[in-house]
């Protein structure tokens, strides 16, 4: 078995006296997709924030590509190849779609540095991945649909050239047609070898798209394993505790 590109060992994270994440452990190999599922308040977002350096862990370890991440500032974690698409579709609403992407390019040093052939992800590649964004390129972030905002948030994350993409609440509030578009894009990204860890409320979709699943309940792991080896009933029992 290959060494996991991301390994989480005994991770505990707290808000005051509340343990939001309790001794969570899992690993994901390069190029795989791992689904993190659980009810609201299960600790999914806190887990992602702890991996990305946005929330300090009380104990445990996070290792990415053989390097420990605990205590590493969030901006350094981005430079090491991890990007987060947070719940809430974080974009600049007052800027156009194209300006949002330009800002991301410049922020990550991809806008004007080095030859184009050295850049794996560019605005043009984002537009190829999400044609709806090209059509809306001049519209403001506040003028586009929720689905387009999610596409834009994913595109901005990709411009940081990540090797691991974390997506919190992939399809929350999106129509079935837009969910299909988003997952087709994620499948294309995954086919190129990118590692995905994502939160999805739709249990069936989580199992169908992922290689592995981790189910959290009140901050603890209630079920983990290969997705195709799990029955829907077992996952739902773990999901609801």
Feature locations, PLM:
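Conserved ABC ATPase signature
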Residues: 140-144
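Conserved catalytic motifs of ABC-family nucleotide-binding domains
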Residues: 161
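Conserved ABC transporter NBD signature motif
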Residues: 60-69, 80, 114, 118-123, ...
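ABC-type ATPase nucleotide-binding domains, specifically the catalytic core motifs of the NBD
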Residues: 16, 57, 72, 97-119, ...
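ABC ATPase C-loop
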Residues: 157-158
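Helix-to-loop junction immediately C-terminal to a conserved catalytic motif
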Residues: 52
